[in-house]
Protein backbone atom coordinates (compact mmCIF):
# COMPACT_ATOMS: atom_id res chain seq x y z
CA UNK A 1 0.00 0.00 0.00
CA UNK A 2 1.21 3.51 -0.85
CA UNK A 3 2.08 5.57 2.22
CA UNK A 4 -0.66 8.03 3.08
CA UNK A 5 0.13 11.66 2.30
CA UNK A 6 -2.53 14.22 3.22
CA UNK A 7 -2.43 17.99 3.20
CA UNK A 8 -3.82 21.01 4.98
CA UNK A 9 -3.70 24.02 2.68
CA UNK A 10 -5.54 27.07 4.02
CA UNK A 11 -5.46 30.62 2.71
CA UNK A 12 -4.05 33.17 5.17
CA UNK A 13 -7.15 35.34 5.50
CA UNK A 14 -8.89 36.37 8.70
CA UNK A 15 -8.73 34.34 11.89
CA UNK A 16 -8.82 30.53 12.02
CA UNK A 17 -12.36 29.17 11.71
CA UNK A 18 -13.40 26.07 13.70
CA UNK A 19 -14.55 24.38 10.47
CA UNK A 20 -11.12 24.94 8.96
CA UNK A 21 -9.44 23.62 12.10
CA UNK A 22 -11.71 20.54 12.06
CA UNK A 23 -10.39 19.85 8.55
CA UNK A 24 -6.82 20.19 9.83
CA UNK A 25 -7.58 17.84 12.73
CA UNK A 26 -9.08 15.12 10.56
CA UNK A 27 -6.15 15.26 8.13
CA UNK A 28 -3.67 15.19 11.01
CA UNK A 29 -5.44 12.30 12.74
CA UNK A 30 -5.63 10.27 9.54
CA UNK A 31 -1.93 10.78 8.89
CA UNK A 32 -1.04 9.77 12.44
CA UNK A 33 -3.44 6.81 12.45
CA UNK A 34 -2.02 5.38 9.22
CA UNK A 35 1.62 6.25 9.87
CA UNK A 36 1.50 8.65 6.94
CA UNK A 37 2.55 12.28 6.55
CA UNK A 38 0.76 15.61 6.86
CA UNK A 39 1.88 18.38 4.52
CA UNK A 40 1.03 21.93 5.58
CA UNK A 41 1.15 24.40 2.73
CA UNK A 42 -0.23 27.91 2.32
CA UNK A 43 -2.42 29.05 -0.58
CA UNK A 44 -1.48 32.73 -0.62
CA UNK A 45 -2.02 33.84 -4.19
CA UNK A 46 -4.73 36.41 -3.37
CA UNK A 47 -2.60 39.44 -2.56
CA UNK A 48 -5.64 41.60 -1.82
CA UNK A 49 -6.90 39.34 0.98
CA UNK A 50 -3.88 37.41 2.26
CA UNK A 51 -1.83 38.73 5.17
CA UNK A 52 1.20 37.76 7.20
CA UNK A 53 -0.88 38.35 10.33
CA UNK A 54 -3.31 35.66 9.23
CA UNK A 55 -0.42 33.35 8.33
CA UNK A 56 0.97 33.77 11.84
CA UNK A 57 -2.51 33.05 13.23
CA UNK A 58 -2.65 29.76 11.34
CA UNK A 59 0.70 28.72 12.79
CA UNK A 60 -0.48 29.77 16.25
CA UNK A 61 -3.66 27.70 15.89
CA UNK A 62 -1.82 24.56 14.78
CA UNK A 63 0.80 24.88 17.50
CA UNK A 64 -1.74 25.64 20.24
CA UNK A 65 -3.68 22.50 19.38
CA UNK A 66 -0.55 20.38 18.99
CA UNK A 67 -1.26 19.53 15.34
CA UNK A 68 2.29 19.06 14.12
CA UNK A 69 3.14 18.50 10.46
CA UNK A 70 5.83 16.52 8.68
CA UNK A 71 6.51 18.73 5.67
CA UNK A 72 5.55 22.28 4.87
CA UNK A 73 5.94 25.86 5.94
CA UNK A 74 8.42 26.53 8.73
CA UNK A 75 9.73 22.92 8.73
CA UNK A 76 10.66 22.48 5.06
CA UNK A 77 10.73 19.25 3.10
CA UNK A 78 11.53 17.76 -0.31
CA UNK A 79 8.90 19.79 -2.19
CA UNK A 80 9.82 23.30 -1.08
CA UNK A 81 8.66 26.00 -1.22
CA UNK A 82 5.32 25.39 0.51
CA UNK A 83 3.73 28.78 -0.13
CA UNK A 84 1.97 29.16 -3.46
CA UNK A 85 3.18 32.74 -3.83
CA UNK A 86 6.72 31.35 -4.10
CA UNK A 87 5.90 28.65 -6.69
CA UNK A 88 4.98 30.77 -9.73
CA UNK A 89 7.75 29.37 -11.93
CA UNK A 90 6.55 25.84 -11.22
CA UNK A 91 2.99 26.67 -12.26
CA UNK A 92 4.11 28.45 -15.43
CA UNK A 93 6.16 25.42 -16.42
CA UNK A 94 3.21 23.07 -15.92
CA UNK A 95 0.87 25.42 -17.78
CA UNK A 96 3.26 25.48 -20.75
CA UNK A 97 3.32 21.67 -20.81
CA UNK A 98 -0.48 21.55 -20.77
CA UNK A 99 -0.65 24.06 -23.64
CA UNK A 100 1.97 22.24 -25.69
CA UNK A 101 0.13 18.94 -25.19
CA UNK A 102 -3.20 20.44 -26.25
CA UNK A 103 -4.77 19.71 -22.86
CA UNK A 104 -5.75 23.35 -22.49
CA UNK A 105 -6.75 25.80 -25.18
CA UNK A 106 -7.10 29.57 -25.60
CA UNK A 107 -10.64 30.91 -25.17
CA UNK A 108 -11.46 34.40 -26.45
CA UNK A 109 -15.22 34.54 -25.87
CA UNK A 110 -16.52 37.26 -23.63
CA UNK A 111 -19.27 36.60 -21.08
CA UNK A 112 -21.66 38.65 -23.20
CA UNK A 113 -20.93 36.57 -26.28
CA UNK A 114 -21.54 33.33 -24.38
CA UNK A 115 -24.90 34.61 -23.12
CA UNK A 116 -25.91 35.76 -26.60
CA UNK A 117 -25.15 32.32 -28.08
CA UNK A 118 -27.33 30.70 -25.40
CA UNK A 119 -30.19 33.10 -26.18
CA UNK A 120 -29.90 32.44 -29.89
CA UNK A 121 -30.18 28.71 -29.21
CA UNK A 122 -33.15 29.16 -26.87
CA UNK A 123 -31.17 28.24 -23.79
CA UNK A 124 -30.88 29.93 -20.39
CA UNK A 125 -28.28 32.71 -20.89
CA UNK A 126 -26.87 31.97 -17.42
CA UNK A 127 -25.91 28.39 -18.22
CA UNK A 128 -22.24 29.26 -18.20
CA UNK A 129 -19.49 28.59 -20.70
CA UNK A 130 -20.53 26.64 -23.82
CA UNK A 131 -17.13 25.24 -24.92
CA UNK A 132 -17.37 27.34 -28.11
CA UNK A 133 -13.66 28.13 -28.35
CA UNK A 134 -12.62 24.47 -28.37
CA UNK A 135 -12.91 24.34 -32.13
CA UNK A 136 -11.65 27.74 -33.21
CA UNK A 137 -9.81 27.73 -36.51
CA UNK A 138 -6.43 29.33 -36.94
CA UNK A 139 -8.09 32.13 -38.92
CA UNK A 140 -10.54 32.83 -36.09
CA UNK A 141 -7.73 32.88 -33.54
CA UNK A 142 -5.75 35.26 -35.74
CA UNK A 143 -8.76 37.55 -36.05
CA UNK A 144 -9.30 37.65 -32.27
CA UNK A 145 -5.62 38.40 -31.74
CA UNK A 146 -5.83 41.21 -34.27
CA UNK A 147 -8.67 42.71 -32.21
CA UNK A 148 -6.29 42.79 -29.26
CA UNK A 149 -8.10 40.07 -27.34
CA UNK A 150 -6.12 38.14 -24.75
CA UNK A 151 -7.40 34.61 -24.16
CA UNK A 152 -7.97 32.79 -20.92
CA UNK A 153 -6.84 29.16 -20.91
CA UNK A 154 -9.39 26.38 -20.42
CA UNK A 155 -8.97 22.67 -19.76
CA UNK A 156 -10.69 20.34 -22.22
CA UNK A 157 -13.18 18.40 -20.10
CA UNK A 158 -13.85 14.87 -21.39
CA UNK A 159 -17.50 14.46 -22.39
CA UNK A 160 -18.39 11.84 -19.81
CA UNK A 161 -20.25 11.41 -16.56
CA UNK A 162 -18.06 11.67 -13.49
CA UNK A 163 -18.20 9.01 -10.79
CA UNK A 164 -15.92 8.37 -7.86
CA UNK A 165 -16.08 6.60 -4.53
CA UNK A 166 -15.92 9.33 -1.93
CA UNK A 167 -14.43 8.16 1.38
CA UNK A 168 -17.21 9.91 3.30
CA UNK A 169 -20.17 9.97 0.90
CA UNK A 170 -19.77 6.73 -1.00
CA UNK A 171 -20.42 6.79 -4.75
CA UNK A 172 -20.85 10.30 -6.13
CA UNK A 173 -21.88 11.13 -9.69
CA UNK A 174 -21.99 14.33 -11.75
CA UNK A 175 -23.43 14.36 -15.26
CA UNK A 176 -21.19 15.51 -18.10
CA UNK A 177 -23.36 18.51 -19.06
CA UNK A 178 -22.75 20.07 -15.64
CA UNK A 179 -19.00 20.28 -16.24
CA UNK A 180 -18.03 22.74 -18.99
CA UNK A 181 -14.41 23.46 -19.85
CA UNK A 182 -13.04 25.60 -17.04
CA UNK A 183 -10.44 28.35 -16.80
CA UNK A 184 -7.02 27.39 -15.43
CA UNK A 185 -5.16 30.63 -16.26
CA UNK A 186 -6.17 34.26 -16.68
CA UNK A 187 -5.67 36.28 -19.82
CA UNK A 188 -2.44 37.67 -18.34
CA UNK A 189 -1.12 34.12 -18.07
CA UNK A 190 -1.49 33.91 -14.29
CA UNK A 191 -2.54 30.39 -13.21
CA UNK A 192 -5.68 30.15 -11.08
CA UNK A 193 -6.45 28.13 -7.95
CA UNK A 194 -8.18 25.59 -10.19
CA UNK A 195 -4.76 24.73 -11.62
CA UNK A 196 -2.27 25.38 -8.84
CA UNK A 197 -4.06 23.39 -6.13
CA UNK A 198 -4.07 20.10 -8.08
CA UNK A 199 -0.55 20.79 -9.38
CA UNK A 200 0.71 21.11 -5.82
CA UNK A 201 -1.13 17.93 -4.82
CA UNK A 202 0.39 16.11 -7.79
CA UNK A 203 3.97 17.28 -7.22
CA UNK A 204 3.72 16.65 -3.47
CA UNK A 205 2.33 13.16 -4.18
CA UNK A 206 -0.82 13.65 -2.12
CA UNK A 207 -2.74 10.37 -1.83
CA UNK A 208 -5.87 11.51 0.03
CA UNK A 209 -7.68 14.85 -0.28
CA UNK A 210 -9.82 15.34 2.84
CA UNK A 211 -11.65 18.65 2.64
CA UNK A 212 -14.95 20.42 3.21
CA UNK A 213 -18.21 19.50 1.52
CA UNK A 214 -18.36 22.93 -0.13
CA UNK A 215 -15.62 21.78 -2.52
CA UNK A 216 -17.50 18.67 -3.64
CA UNK A 217 -18.79 20.23 -6.92
CA UNK A 218 -15.24 21.05 -8.04
CA UNK A 219 -14.10 17.43 -7.80
CA UNK A 220 -14.93 16.39 -11.40
CA UNK A 221 -12.83 19.28 -12.73
CA UNK A 222 -9.96 18.33 -10.47
CA UNK A 223 -10.11 14.67 -11.44
CA UNK A 224 -10.02 15.71 -15.11
CA UNK A 225 -7.02 17.91 -14.44
CA UNK A 226 -5.19 15.09 -12.59
CA UNK A 227 -5.74 12.87 -15.62
CA UNK A 228 -4.26 15.57 -17.86
CA UNK A 229 -1.33 16.02 -15.47
CA UNK A 230 -0.68 12.29 -15.60
CA UNK A 231 -0.64 12.37 -19.39
CA UNK A 232 2.06 15.06 -19.39
CA UNK A 233 4.11 13.30 -16.70
CA UNK A 234 3.48 15.73 -13.83
CA UNK A 235 1.18 13.52 -11.71
CA UNK A 236 1.68 9.90 -10.78
CA UNK A 237 -1.82 9.28 -9.46
CA UNK A 238 -5.24 10.75 -8.82
CA UNK A 239 -5.79 11.09 -5.07
CA UNK A 240 -8.73 9.60 -3.22
CA UNK A 241 -11.29 12.18 -2.08
CA UNK A 242 -13.23 12.50 1.14
CA UNK A 243 -15.60 15.43 1.69
CA UNK A 244 -16.25 16.33 5.32
CA UNK A 245 -19.72 17.43 6.45
CA UNK A 246 -20.65 21.06 6.94
CA UNK A 247 -20.42 22.52 10.43
CA UNK A 248 -23.74 24.20 11.16
CA UNK A 249 -24.40 27.12 13.48
CA UNK A 250 -27.51 28.70 14.97
CA UNK A 251 -30.73 28.32 13.02
CA UNK A 252 -29.32 25.30 11.19
CA UNK A 253 -27.28 27.55 8.91
CA UNK A 254 -23.71 26.84 7.88
CA UNK A 255 -21.32 28.25 10.47
CA UNK A 256 -19.70 31.31 8.91
CA UNK A 257 -16.76 33.49 9.83
CA UNK A 258 -19.23 36.10 11.06
CA UNK A 259 -20.53 33.77 13.79
CA UNK A 260 -18.73 34.33 17.12
CA UNK A 261 -18.66 30.56 17.69
CA UNK A 262 -16.53 30.12 14.57
CA UNK A 263 -13.52 32.01 15.96
CA UNK A 264 -11.02 29.51 17.37
CA UNK A 265 -9.10 32.15 19.31
CA UNK A 266 -12.25 33.47 20.95
CA UNK A 267 -12.74 30.01 22.40
CA UNK A 268 -9.17 30.10 23.68
CA UNK A 269 -9.78 33.52 25.24
CA UNK A 270 -12.93 32.11 26.84
CA UNK A 271 -10.89 29.38 28.48
CA UNK A 272 -11.34 26.34 26.26
CA UNK A 273 -8.24 24.15 26.54
CA UNK A 274 -6.69 22.30 23.56
CA UNK A 275 -7.77 18.88 24.82
CA UNK A 276 -11.38 20.00 25.08
CA UNK A 277 -11.37 21.69 21.68
CA UNK A 278 -9.78 18.70 19.92
CA UNK A 279 -12.23 16.28 21.56
CA UNK A 280 -15.20 18.40 20.54
CA UNK A 281 -14.02 19.04 16.98
CA UNK A 282 -13.46 15.31 16.64
CA UNK A 283 -17.16 14.78 17.33
CA UNK A 284 -18.20 17.06 14.46
CA UNK A 285 -18.81 14.25 12.01
CA UNK A 286 -17.22 11.32 13.86
CA UNK A 287 -17.69 9.42 17.11
CA UNK A 288 -15.67 6.94 19.13
CA UNK A 289 -18.74 5.00 20.25
CA UNK A 290 -22.41 5.59 20.92
CA UNK A 291 -21.86 5.92 24.66
CA UNK A 292 -18.47 7.68 24.86
CA UNK A 293 -18.08 11.36 24.05
CA UNK A 294 -14.92 11.98 26.08
CA UNK A 295 -11.59 10.78 24.73
CA UNK A 296 -7.95 11.78 24.68
CA UNK A 297 -6.16 12.81 21.53
CA UNK A 298 -4.27 9.51 21.70
CA UNK A 299 -7.55 7.59 21.71
CA UNK A 300 -8.78 9.72 18.84
CA UNK A 301 -5.75 8.95 16.69
CA UNK A 302 -5.85 5.24 17.53
CA UNK A 303 -9.50 4.90 16.49
CA UNK A 304 -9.93 7.50 13.74
CA UNK A 305 -10.71 6.34 10.22
CA UNK A 306 -11.97 8.68 7.54
CA UNK A 307 -14.35 5.94 6.40
CA UNK A 308 -16.22 6.32 9.71
CA UNK A 309 -16.94 10.02 9.18
CA UNK A 310 -20.64 10.72 8.71
CA UNK A 311 -21.90 12.68 5.73
CA UNK A 312 -24.66 14.50 7.60
CA UNK A 313 -24.05 18.10 8.71
CA UNK A 314 -22.66 18.52 12.23
CA UNK A 315 -24.11 21.21 14.49
CA UNK A 316 -21.79 23.32 16.62
CA UNK A 317 -23.10 23.23 20.20
CA UNK A 318 -21.38 25.68 22.55
CA UNK A 319 -22.82 24.06 25.69
CA UNK A 320 -21.56 20.64 24.67
CA UNK A 321 -18.12 22.08 23.92
CA UNK A 322 -17.99 23.58 27.41
CA UNK A 323 -19.22 20.36 29.04
CA UNK A 324 -16.51 18.36 27.25
CA UNK A 325 -13.96 21.00 28.18
CA UNK A 326 -14.98 20.68 31.84
CA UNK A 327 -14.24 16.96 31.72
CA UNK A 328 -10.79 17.58 30.27
CA UNK A 329 -10.06 20.25 32.88
CA UNK A 330 -10.84 17.68 35.58
CA UNK A 331 -8.60 15.11 33.89
CA UNK A 332 -5.54 17.38 34.13
CA UNK A 333 -3.06 16.60 36.91
CA UNK A 334 -3.40 19.22 39.64
CA UNK A 335 -0.01 20.79 38.95
CA UNK A 336 -0.66 21.07 35.23
CA UNK A 337 -4.09 22.57 35.80
CA UNK A 338 -2.54 25.15 38.10
CA UNK A 339 -0.01 26.11 35.40
CA UNK A 340 -2.71 26.33 32.72
CA UNK A 341 -4.96 28.45 34.92
CA UNK A 342 -2.13 30.77 35.94
CA UNK A 343 -1.08 31.23 32.29
CA UNK A 344 -4.66 31.93 31.20
CA UNK A 345 -5.27 34.47 33.96
CA UNK A 346 -1.96 36.16 33.16
CA UNK A 347 -2.69 36.47 29.43
CA UNK A 348 -6.39 37.24 29.39
CA UNK A 349 -7.32 38.86 32.73
CA UNK A 350 -6.11 41.38 35.28
CA UNK A 351 -5.44 38.72 37.92
CA UNK A 352 -2.14 39.83 39.51
CA UNK A 353 0.88 37.80 38.45
CA UNK A 354 2.48 38.29 41.87
CA UNK A 355 -0.35 36.54 43.73
CA UNK A 356 1.45 34.20 46.18
CA UNK A 357 2.22 30.80 44.64
CA UNK A 358 1.16 28.77 47.68
CA UNK A 359 -2.19 30.54 47.89
CA UNK A 360 -2.74 30.23 44.14
CA UNK A 361 -2.07 26.50 44.29
CA UNK A 362 -4.69 26.18 47.04
CA UNK A 363 -7.16 28.31 45.07
CA UNK A 364 -6.62 26.32 41.86
CA UNK A 365 -7.33 23.10 43.70
CA UNK A 366 -10.65 24.53 44.89
CA UNK A 367 -11.92 25.48 41.42
CA UNK A 368 -10.65 22.67 39.19
CA UNK A 369 -13.78 20.55 39.62
CA UNK A 370 -16.13 23.54 39.60
CA UNK A 371 -15.45 25.19 36.24
CA UNK A 372 -16.18 24.42 32.60
CA UNK A 373 -13.64 26.91 31.21
CA UNK A 374 -10.50 28.60 32.49
CA UNK A 375 -12.30 31.92 32.22
CA UNK A 376 -14.75 30.69 34.85
CA UNK A 377 -11.74 30.22 37.12
CA UNK A 378 -11.25 33.98 36.99
CA UNK A 379 -14.92 34.56 37.75
CA UNK A 380 -14.66 32.37 40.85
CA UNK A 381 -11.34 33.75 42.11
CA UNK A 382 -11.41 37.45 41.31
CA UNK A 383 -12.94 38.28 44.71
CA UNK A 384 -9.64 37.19 46.27
CA UNK A 385 -7.74 40.01 44.56
CA UNK A 386 -10.42 42.70 44.72
CA UNK A 387 -9.90 45.44 47.29
CA UNK A 388 -12.46 45.20 50.10
CA UNK A 389 -13.85 48.64 49.31
CA UNK A 390 -14.17 47.75 45.60
CA UNK A 391 -16.14 44.54 46.06
CA UNK A 392 -19.49 44.85 44.30
CA UNK A 393 -22.28 42.54 45.41
CA UNK A 394 -24.23 40.78 42.70
CA UNK A 395 -27.65 42.39 42.95
CA UNK A 396 -29.66 39.22 42.46
CA UNK A 397 -27.56 37.28 44.98
CA UNK A 398 -27.70 40.10 47.53
CA UNK A 399 -31.48 40.51 47.24
CA UNK A 400 -31.95 36.80 47.85
CA UNK A 401 -29.40 36.26 50.62
CA UNK A 402 -29.14 39.58 52.49
CA UNK A 403 -32.72 39.91 53.69
CA UNK A 404 -33.81 40.69 57.25
CA UNK A 405 -33.26 37.05 58.17
CA UNK A 406 -29.56 37.34 57.30
CA UNK A 407 -28.85 39.72 60.19
CA UNK A 408 -28.72 36.94 62.78
CA UNK A 409 -26.26 34.64 60.95
CA UNK A 410 -24.10 37.62 59.95
CA UNK A 411 -23.86 38.86 63.55
CA UNK A 412 -23.19 35.38 64.88
CA UNK A 413 -20.67 34.67 62.15
CA UNK A 414 -18.75 37.88 62.81
CA UNK A 415 -18.62 37.19 66.54
CA UNK A 416 -17.49 33.60 66.00
CA UNK A 417 -14.76 34.51 63.54
CA UNK A 418 -13.41 37.33 65.69
CA UNK A 419 -12.62 34.70 68.31
CA UNK A 420 -10.70 32.36 65.97
CA UNK A 421 -7.09 32.28 67.14
CA UNK A 422 -5.37 30.58 64.20
CA UNK A 423 -6.90 31.47 60.82
CA UNK A 424 -7.15 28.04 59.14
CA UNK A 425 -9.92 26.27 57.28
CA UNK A 426 -10.60 23.71 60.06
CA UNK A 427 -10.77 26.42 62.73
CA UNK A 428 -13.01 28.64 60.59
CA UNK A 429 -15.34 25.74 59.85
CA UNK A 430 -15.50 24.68 63.50
CA UNK A 431 -16.30 28.20 64.72
CA UNK A 432 -19.05 28.81 62.16
CA UNK A 433 -20.58 25.36 62.55
CA UNK A 434 -20.82 25.80 66.31
CA UNK A 435 -22.23 29.34 66.13
CA UNK A 436 -24.64 28.98 63.21
CA UNK A 437 -25.61 25.33 62.93
CA UNK A 438 -25.44 24.09 66.50
CA UNK A 439 -26.36 27.18 68.52
CA UNK A 440 -28.77 28.93 66.12
CA UNK A 441 -30.07 25.70 64.61
CA UNK A 442 -29.82 27.00 61.04
CA UNK A 443 -29.54 24.81 57.98
CA UNK A 444 -26.16 25.21 56.21
CA UNK A 445 -27.74 26.73 53.08
CA UNK A 446 -29.45 29.41 55.15
CA UNK A 447 -26.56 29.89 57.52
CA UNK A 448 -23.82 30.27 54.95
CA UNK A 449 -25.61 31.92 52.01
CA UNK A 450 -25.32 35.42 53.43
CA UNK A 451 -21.68 34.90 54.41
CA UNK A 452 -20.78 33.66 50.93
CA UNK A 453 -22.33 36.68 49.22
CA UNK A 454 -20.71 39.00 51.76
CA UNK A 455 -17.14 37.82 51.18
CA UNK A 456 -17.27 36.98 47.44
CA UNK A 457 -20.02 39.23 46.13
CA UNK A 458 -21.68 36.23 44.45
CA UNK A 459 -24.02 33.36 45.21
CA UNK A 460 -21.47 30.89 43.81
CA UNK A 461 -17.88 30.75 45.03
CA UNK A 462 -15.23 28.24 45.97
CA UNK A 463 -15.93 26.42 49.27
CA UNK A 464 -16.73 29.01 51.94
CA UNK A 465 -14.29 28.10 54.70
CA UNK A 466 -11.36 27.69 52.32
CA UNK A 467 -12.28 31.00 50.65
CA UNK A 468 -12.15 32.73 54.02
CA UNK A 469 -8.71 31.27 54.74
CA UNK A 470 -7.44 32.49 51.36
CA UNK A 471 -9.02 35.91 51.83
CA UNK A 472 -7.49 36.33 55.28
CA UNK A 473 -8.94 37.35 58.63
CA UNK A 474 -8.92 41.11 58.08
CA UNK A 475 -10.59 41.11 54.65
CA UNK A 476 -13.11 38.46 55.66
CA UNK A 477 -14.27 40.41 58.71
CA UNK A 478 -14.22 43.74 56.85
CA UNK A 479 -16.51 42.33 54.16
CA UNK A 480 -18.84 40.65 56.63
CA UNK A 481 -19.23 43.89 58.58
CA UNK A 482 -19.89 45.85 55.38
CA UNK A 483 -22.56 43.35 54.34
CA UNK A 484 -24.10 43.46 57.82
CA UNK A 485 -24.34 47.24 57.59
CA UNK A 486 -26.08 46.92 54.22
CA UNK A 487 -28.61 44.32 55.42
CA UNK A 488 -31.45 44.20 54.60
CA UNK A 489 -30.06 44.84 51.13
CA UNK A 490 -31.53 47.63 49.06
CA UNK A 491 -30.56 47.88 45.40
CA UNK A 492 -29.09 51.21 44.36
CA UNK A 493 -31.53 53.45 42.50
UniProtKB/Swiss-Prot annotation:
Enzyme class: ligase
Domain of life: Bacteria
Reaction(s) catalysed by this chain's protein: tRNA(Glu) + L-glutamate + ATP = L-glutamyl-tRNA(Glu) + AMP + diphosphate
SUPFAM superfamilies the UniProt entry points to: An anticodon-binding domain of class I aminoacyl-tRNA synthetases, Nucleotidylyl transferase
Motif 'KMSKS' region: where in chain: 254-258
Cell compartments where the protein resides: Cytoplasm
InterPro entries in the record: aa-tRNA-synth_I_cd-bd (IPR045462), aa-tRNA-synth_I_codon-bd_sub2 (IPR020751), aa_tRNA-synth_I_cd-bd_sf (IPR008925), Glu-tRNA-ligase_bac/mito (IPR004527), Glu-tRNA-synth_I_codon-bd_sub1 (IPR020752), Glu/Gln-tRNA-synth (IPR000924), Glu/Gln-tRNA-synth_Ib_cat-dom (IPR020058), GluQ/Sye (IPR049940)
GO CC terms of this entry: cytosol
This enzyme's EC code(s): 6.1.1.17
Function: Catalyzes the attachment of glutamate to tRNA(Glu) in a two-step reaction: glutamate is first activated by ATP to form Glu-AMP and then transferred to the acceptor end of tRNA(Glu).
Subunit structure: Monomer.
Protein name according to UniProt: Glutamate--tRNA ligase
Origin organism lineage: Bacteria, Bacillati, Actinomycetota, Actinomycetes, Mycobacteriales
Amino acid sequence: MTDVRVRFCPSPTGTPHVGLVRTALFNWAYARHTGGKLIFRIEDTDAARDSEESYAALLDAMNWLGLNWDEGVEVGGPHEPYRQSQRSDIYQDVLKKLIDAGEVYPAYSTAEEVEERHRAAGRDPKLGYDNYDRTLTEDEITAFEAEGRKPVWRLRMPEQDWKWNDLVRGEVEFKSFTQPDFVVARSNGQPLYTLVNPVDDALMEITHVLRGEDLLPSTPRQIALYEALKRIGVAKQTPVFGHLPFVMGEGNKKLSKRDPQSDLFQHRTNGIIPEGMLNYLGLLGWSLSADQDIFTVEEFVANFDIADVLGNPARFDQKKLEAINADHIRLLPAGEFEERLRAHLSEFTDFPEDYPAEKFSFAAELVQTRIKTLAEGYDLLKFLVTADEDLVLDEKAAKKNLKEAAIEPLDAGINALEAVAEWTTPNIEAALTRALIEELGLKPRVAYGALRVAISGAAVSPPLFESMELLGRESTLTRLRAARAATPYQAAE
